[in-house]
């Protein structure tokens, strides 16, 4: 869970490949393709602040935490993928960065 309207930041430089609410259950969502072949996903957004084709930089605000899709509290669903395979994002963070983890 996260406070409604909190800024959502791009995890790394990349190009927005999807920014919409057309996938059932996910609400408003952004997908970013990165040069290393990874894709990051940010779902349940209240607002989308980037468009398909936009070049985004690490730390750039791309959206706001929301309560869209199949959720009952404001939250951000973050995913890191390589192709169709979901990866554990904690294994790909830059050493020394802090991370707040929430689980169900």
Question: Predicted regions span which residues?
Answer:
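Catalytic cores of peptidoglycan-degrading enzymes
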Residues: 1-104
